[in-house]
């Protein structure tokens, strides 16, 4: 599995993955590292928030539903420290509601600053496309070409 052609021109990113499912952490880490990115994982929102405060990350993958501090609360707190960091939400529950049903977690996450979403189980190509899209959008939005300097929609 090589680096996608679209990613070859990007500065490889430092990515934080926050998910309580160790299998998901491992899968995402493997896919992203094979694509050349540096990956740090955390098993809950509090640990992720702590790492976010000490690391310089270009992108955050964040599970919505975790015990303790859920993804929504984690996202609120990350936004206070890093208002421009691109966040991709991931969840095993349906993210978007069918018309006429509630709740719509994607709308909630978008209001808190998520720029993209993936529903588990996701295809490796979808994960890599979401990362590439977010990093390219952030690069275009940043005059200094640093992915973490600007956030643009990367859906």
Please state what every model-predicted region is.
Residues 73, 94-116, 129:
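Alpha4 helix (beta4-alpha4-beta5 surface) of REC/receiver domains from two-component response regulators
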Residues 1-14, 125-155:
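Non-catalytic signal-transmission and effector/linker regions of two-component phosphorelay proteins
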Residues 66:
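Receiver (REC) domain active-site loop signature in two-component systems and cognate sites
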Residues 50, 72-84, 104:
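Short amphipathic alpha-helix used as the core "switch/output" element in two-component signaling
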Residues 26-34:
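Charged docking surfaces used in two-component/phosphorelay signaling
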Residues 55-61:
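Active-site beta3 strand of CheY-like receiver
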């Amino acid at each position: 599995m090589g680096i996608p052609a679209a990613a070859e021109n990007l500065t490889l990113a430092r990515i934080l993955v926050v998910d309580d499912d160790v299998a998901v952490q491992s899968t995402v880490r493997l896919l992203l590292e094979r694509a050349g990115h540096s990956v740090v994982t955390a098993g809950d929102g509090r640990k992720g928030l702590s790492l976010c405060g000490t690391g310089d990350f270009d992108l955050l993958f964040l599970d919505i539903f975790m015990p303790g501090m859920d993804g929504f609360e984690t996202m609120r707190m990350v936004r206070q420290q890093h208002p421009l960091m691109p966040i991709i939400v991931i969840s095993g529950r349906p993210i978007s509601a069918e018309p006429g049903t509630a709740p719509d977690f994607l709308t909630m996450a978008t209001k808190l600053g998520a720029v993209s979403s993936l529903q588990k189980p996701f295809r490796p190509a979808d994960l890599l496309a979401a990362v590439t899209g977010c990093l390219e959008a952030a690069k275009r939005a940043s005059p200094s070409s640093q992915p973490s300097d600007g956030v643009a929609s990367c859906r």
